[in-house]
């Protein structure tokens, strides 16, 4: 735990690209310090980050920092627009770039009043818990993974409200005030029903915004069957881009003039025409080369039309459960389809990175705007950390990386900058004749 005397240069230089988003310089400084805390503070709540701050002179209150970061002075939507402008040059001319669409759960078991936090069954953990559903759009090449947008899905209250309305319904109302209250309840129910967006709706809006800005002209899309919708695929195709998606085994395709489940077709091919599966080698995003046995063919699906299907086995004897991939790129070979699909897992890395390193699910704020700001600042901090330049480490703990910069080294580099500024302050205060107790009182008040 290192006191933060000033914003480290690595963060300050990159945050200057976002200066126009913030009105007041004092508020901008609070946000800079908050982003720094998201990276180096062990407690990534606002209280934990504020406790590390050191100001010379009058120290701003925690309420002042809370207001600057979560309540006023800037727009988180504009922040993400500027963030996409900031990261876009790093993805041009760097080989294959793919935008992955996905969602994750941000758990808050002790925060029932946090915006978007609902108690439901968590199919990942296999139990009931409280969590927010966070939809993400992530772009990646073979070196960088950057979040393009992060949106918290609002809770679906329609069913519970409808049940309440049914239970409290009356045949008649004797008082006008009671009738007015009932009318308001009905109007609010209709309002919430119209405002609610499914995860697929949010993903489509993200793609529409990204394509309208035109910053990632060469990036295709990858997503799993939970995001796959007709509206999404049609929009991507209308922009002259391609998509790759995994599909469920129950999806029906037109095979020999009949509509059949894709797993039925795969089993028939495996048992009767095993020679139709071709051995290929795929160079994945992480540098690994994987061997697969694949069958690919153009097929027709209901509503989606003609697409390319790829059936994948991992063993030469075609044992195990196959995977099924679909793409609108009819001219792509199976190798290119699977290489593009390997970039879909960048979103999983982004989620894990965000939760473990930059505090994506650490905030305890309740209001909708505050929750959005925290997630989006975590997204910005993640990109900053990847761009921190580090030299070759002489420490034994990083020998395993064989000269390749790790996230731990980048965090350490920023922490060293924070430590250096603290030592410089201590040096100056001691030269001014301050006692050890005076310096301790400034750095870590009792």
Predicted feature descriptions by range:
Residues 133, 346, 350, 376-379:
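Catalytic-loop motifs flanking and including active-site residues across diverse enzymes
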């Amino acid at each position: 735990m290192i006191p933060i005397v000033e914003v480290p240069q690595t963060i300050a230089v990159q945050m200057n690209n976002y200066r126009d988003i913030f009105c007041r310089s004092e508020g901008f400084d609070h946000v800079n310090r908050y982003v720094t805390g998201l990276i180096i503070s062990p407690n990534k709540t606002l209280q934990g980050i504020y406790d590390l701050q050191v100001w010379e002179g009058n120290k701003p209150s925690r309420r002042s920092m809370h207001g600057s970061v979560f309540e006023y002075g800037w727009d988180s939507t504009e922040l993400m627009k500027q963030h996409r402008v900031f990261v876009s040059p790093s993805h041009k001319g760097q080989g294959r770039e793919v935008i992955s669409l996905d969602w994750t759960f941000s758990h808050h078991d002790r925060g029932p009043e946090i915006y978007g936090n609902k108690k439901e069954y968590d199919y990942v953990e296999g139990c009931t818990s409280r969590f927010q559903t966070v939809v993400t759009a992530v772009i990646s090449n073979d070196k960088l993974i950057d979040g393009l947008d992060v949106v918290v899905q609002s809770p679906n209250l329609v069913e519970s409200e409808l049940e309440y309305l049914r239970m409290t319904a009356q045949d008649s109302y004797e008082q006008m005030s009671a009738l007015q209250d009932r009318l308001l309840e009905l109007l609010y129910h209709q309002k919430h029903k119209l405002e609610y967006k499914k995860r697929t709706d949010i993903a489509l809006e993200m793609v529409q915004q990204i394509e309208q800005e035109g910053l990632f002209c060469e990036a295709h899309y990858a997503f799993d069957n939970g995001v796959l919708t007709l509206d999404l695929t049609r929009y991507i195709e209308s922009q002259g881009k391609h998509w790759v998606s995994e599909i469920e085994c129950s999806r029906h395709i037109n095979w020999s003039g009949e509509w059949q489940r894709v797993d039925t077709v795969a089993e028939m091919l495996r048992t009767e025409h095993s020679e139709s599966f071709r051995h290929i080698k795929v160079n994945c995003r992480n540098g690994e080369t994987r061997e697969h046995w694949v069958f690919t063919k153009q097929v027709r699906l209901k509503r989606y039309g003609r697409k390319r299907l790829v059936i994948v086995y991992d063993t030469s004897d075609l044992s195990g459960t196959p995977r099924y991939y679909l793409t609108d790129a009819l001219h792509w070979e199976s190798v290119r389809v699977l290489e593009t699909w390997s970039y879909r897992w960048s979103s999983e890395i982004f989620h894990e990175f965000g939760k473990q390193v930059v505090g994506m699910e650490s905030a305890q704020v309740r209001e909708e705007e505050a929750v959005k700001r925290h997630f989006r600042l975590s997204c910005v901090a993640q990109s900053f950390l990847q761009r921190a330049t580090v030299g070759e480490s002489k420490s034994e703990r990083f020998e395993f990386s064989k000269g390749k910069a790790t996230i731990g080294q980048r965090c350490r580099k920023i922490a060293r900058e924070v430590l250096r500024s603290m030592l410089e302050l201590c040096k100056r205060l001691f030269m001014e004749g301050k006692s050890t107790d005076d310096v301790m009182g400034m750095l870590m008040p009792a």
